[in-house]
Amino acid sequence: MLTSPSNALHSSTPQFWPLRRSKLCRSRNFPRFHSGERSSGGGGKLCSLSLLSGSGAGKFSVRALVRPDDTDDADSVGDGSLAFPNHVSVKIPFGNREILVETGLMGRQASSAVTVTDGETIVYTSVCLADVPSEPSDFLPLYVHYQERFSAVGRTSGGFFKREGRTKDHEVLICRLIDRPLRPTMPKGFYNETQILSWVLSYDGLHAPDALAVTSAGIAVALSEVPNAKAIAGVRVGLIGGEFIVNPTVKEMEESQLDLFLAGTDTAILTIEGYSNFLPEEMLLQAVKVGQDAVQATCIAIEVLAKKYGKPKMLDAIRLPPPELYKHVKELAGEELTKALQIKSKISRRKAISSLEEKVLTILTEKGYVIDEVAFGTIEAQPDLLEDEDEDEEVVPEGEVDQGDVHIRPIPRKPIPLLFSEVDVKLVFKEVSSKLLRRRIVEGGKRSDGRTLDEIRPINSRCGLLPRAHGSTLFTRGETQALAVVTLGDKQMAQRIDNLEGSDEYKRFYLQYTFPPSSVGEVGRIGAPSRREIGHGTLAERALETILPSDDDFPYTIRVESTVIESNGSSSMASVCGGCLALQDAGVPVKCSVAGIAMGMVWDTEEFGGDGSPLILSDITGAEDASGDMDFKVAGNEDGVTAFQMDIKVGGITLEIMEKALIQAKAGRRHILAEMAKCSPPPTLSLSKYAPLILIMKVHPSKVYSLIGSGGKKVKSIIEESGVEAIDMQDDGTVKIMAIDVASLERAKAIISGLTMVPSVGDIYRNCEIKSMAPYGAFVEIAPGREGLCHISELSAEWLAKPEDAYKVGDRIDVKLIEVNEKGQLRLSVRALLPESETDKDSQKQQPAGDSTKDKSSQRKYVNTSSKDRAAAGASKVSSGDELVLKKKDVRRATGGSSDKTMNSNSSTNEESLVNGEATIS
């Protein structure tokens, strides 16, 4: 099966390290530098740059590889100071305006560093590379960190340490926006760790820094030594008043119906992410076209800047596996690998492919093609592979040795096998597997699980799995399964967002996506959410946000928790489908149902006998995502799109390809929505009995503070007394009460009604409790927290020496409001509710003789008839009887000392508190 090992020392293309970088050879296959000429004796003459340390068997060689023009320090000048690049400042187009790009002023020791200014928003970006390449893998060692400094807006962090903490979610999302368009432009085989740091140094609140940060990173990479293929740039497109605006301001985006971010090169689109209000596919393509034109203009300017001021690229650092290794792997595993890729079950297929990979590695190792132990990145001791040399020995070709020259020993040439590292074998095996998978799709029109290109996996969904959850759904599509759970709460459950503006922002709806390692049958880390989890959760959240009711129609904070139980591709879109059904199961009145689908693409290249046309795949699996050329997620209903995200793994795509993918995705969404309608058991469409109850009341805005109290004492006492969960009060007078049962909700309502009502003369209050006594009368609670004075003369129709002669604390009586003074103090009367006959009879009684003082005093304790009539005249009669209708009249707040028991009126009228002028206090 295997051909004989080659006599060649190495098979890879000779590699040269870049300017001003000294490297050490660490691989047996790494070539020596040979001079262009050979000695007359036919031996290879070593270049003077190849330094041999030690000789003979068991010795090892260390070769310092430096460019010939690096013998003199290029970074030094005559005075010993470092020679840094000159300060460069240019303007380049950025949508409908220009941005200022500066380099050479800051971060001069980095591979490249730029500051990009838009208005008064400034983003600084630096690029640095490791001197030593990391171990080869199928993942580019690119690390992006984006941070918004509080000092950019003249603020300081509110934390104890007064410095920026861990990366916030929206910063993670911008990190992903920077990372995703850069990766496709990086060449395979480049393993030097690359770090991109991007900081917002100044923010004017008008020009958003996200698209600016992506463009800044594209400029920095173009100027650096990173061997990227093309420069990239990013823009944001909004739809305002029916017109597409490139890079709109923050205020303009508040009115936009579209939030589209696009990044690419001067010829192709690399990344798209956006959210809209059921935007038709045709308008979405128009927006992409507008954004692509803006990106193209920016990228052309960046390319010109890079050619003039950029550093030489590290093309010589690219290390690819030897071409012969592909041939060996195909010979050993081609047929078996093709059969393994046709296994429908993901786990069974993965185990079969893994077993075959180990088999190939074992065979190559036994044949002597694989190095047993490779410590990539360390200096390796190795015998000289060409020959053993001593200082007193001269090596001459065999047949030219004189018998008398005993000190000269001919050394025959031995064939040296071609050696591969274990990492190279695994990389090549994976690439061969990917090509075979793509070949099956292109040539046979069938995918690994037997589906056609536009076929969607079987779908099953169930609602109401979790009895105590407010809403739950298990959504299954093929081997991808998501458990979506909805929790309802009040504003205190809202997610607080810390931003540069410093304004308190709360998210009423948020989706949290979790991808545990068990979902793919692996053992892994469990901890804080990864960048991938944050990104996928945000995409699903924005897809569902459009269908939610307004806060006025549904005053709940909504949390959706999507846990991926099983994954084989498109788990974020499964979260959209499961989340939509879970919202309906929780009783959230959504506007419509939405679904999500992930689209893929495989090029029908000449390698497979094709013409280079794209093949669009619907509902891709994990293997198709990893081996394909595109991952395009689209969510929406039958008519429009709510969220979309596209990542390209090749040089980019055109608008025609995107249009084809959108049309196919629309058909797929309709099919998924039809399957979701078959959910069994279906969503309940009503609130769970375990969901909290929320009552909304309106009070006068001026009375909100009195309900809250000093330091929140009053509202806390209301919560404690009534037993509700929470009370939220807004500046406009809206009061939201949340409770788990109706009884506590009614108690809180009664308390707030009492505190917020405005009493009017003539109002009658039944069953009121006497709270305390004084020599001059009794204090009666007419509503929770509201008391009035019933003077001793108004407690009874008969004369009383003291209030205790008629009542005691705790007794309940009916009273009538007869006066409200200028301080808001209430004067009540029991006597005013007594029948007229008792009052008249009592007024005709004679006073005791000889007690003139008592007579005068008692006269003062009676209500003056004319005064009572004037009070009664202020009230309007109801047509059906003699009860008075409540007047909506504000009373200003009054305070008094504890000695005279002054009452306070701290709130406004509650229209539901009184009926026909009466309020029953239970």
Swiss-Prot record:
Role this protein plays: Involved in the metabolism of all major classes of plastid RNAs. Required for efficient 3'-end processing of mRNAs and 3'-end maturation of rRNA transcripts, but is not sufficient to mediate their degradation. Mediates tRNA degradation. May function as a poly(A) mRNA 3'-5' degrading phosphorylase. May be required for plastid ribosome assembly and non-coding RNA biogenesis and accumulation. Seems not required for efficient translation.
One Gene Ontology cellular component: chloroplast
Domain of life according to the entry: Eukaryota
The name this protein goes by in its record: Polyribonucleotide nucleotidyltransferase 1, chloroplastic
S1 motif domain residues: 762-831
Primary location class: plastid
Phenotype for residue 596 to R: Loss of activity
An annotated Gene Ontology molecular function: mRNA binding
Family indicated by similarity: Belongs to the polyribonucleotide nucleotidyltransferase family.
Keywords linked to the UniProt accession: Chloroplast, Exonuclease, Hydrolase, mRNA processing, Nuclease, Nucleotidyltransferase, Plastid, RNA-binding, rRNA processing, Transferase, Transit peptide, tRNA processing
Enzyme Commission number(s) from the entry: 2.7.7.8
GN (gene name): PNP1
One of the protein's GO biological processes: rRNA processing
SMART domains, per the entry: KH, S1
